[in-house]
A protein has these predicted regions:
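Beta-strand-enriched cores of mature, soluble protein domains
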Residues: 30-205
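Secretory targeting and sorting signals
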Residues: 1-30
Length: 205
């Protein structure tokens, strides 16, 4: 499992960050844009609503992924891999230049899930609510630029309410290499701190 995949599963922004969205003009004043003409186009399942926004094109998006049930988590406890189940919903926007090339993705994800030890049947709950900003280095080239995730991060706890782990801080990821190029604060989950993961394993043993 890459650092990026694990961070996308775990990293959360639980503070009061709010997407920076320009005040919308009345719907009647918007000039609609066909999402399929953009580079790259937002997937249809994102329910994009695209329109001319000054010198740019903006697409509002909102969607939920299919539920994930008992997927491998990448966290191994004494030879047993914990299973992850979760839901994910997303709201946000994409900004394109006047030629229809993607410049920025700005979105907020809400996750709720569990880690389950299949041997013991014990479960830990986790939640996250992260805000991400992906600024493309090359307009239209999705695999370039940096993605920033910041703010207070994930909480993992037991059903009786006892907190097992928290993860908080600021991360900058190089999208092309999938590497974290800047990190601040406390990230035991993102970086797989053995002591932190041992605490989770012990709670589910």
């Amino acid at each position: 499992m890459t650092v990026r995949r694990f961070s996308r599963l775990i990293i959360a922004v639980t503070g009061g960050l709010v997407l920076t969205v320009a005040l919308a003009a009345p719907a009647s004043a918007r000039t609609p844009v066909d999402p399929s003409t953009l580079n790259p186009p937002p997937p249809p399942e994102f329910n994009p609503v695209c329109f001319v926004d000054g010198s740019h094109i903006t697409c509002d998006i909102a969607f939920s992924d299919p539920d994930v049930v008992d997927a491998p988590s990448g966290i191994v406890c004494g030879g047993t891999e914990l299973l992850d189940s979760h839901t994910r919903s997303v709201v946000g926007k994409r900004t394109y230049d006047a030629d229809g090339n993607l410049l920025q993705r700005h979105f907020r994800e809400s996750w709720d899930g569990t880690f389950r030890n299949p041997d013991t049947g014990l479960v830990a709950l986790w939640t996250q609510d992260d805000t991400d900003i992906h600024n493309l280095a090359v307009p239209g080239d999705f695999a370039t630029g940096t993605e920033t995730q910041s703010g207070p991060i994930t909480r993992v706890w037991l059903p009786d309410g006892g907190t097992i782990l928290t993860d908080a801080g600021h991360l900058v990821i190089d999208v092309a290499t999938d590497e974290i190029v800047q990190a601040s604060a406390h990230h035991p989950l993102v970086f797989g701190d053995p002591a932190a993961l041992a605490t989770l394993c012990a709670a589910l043993d």
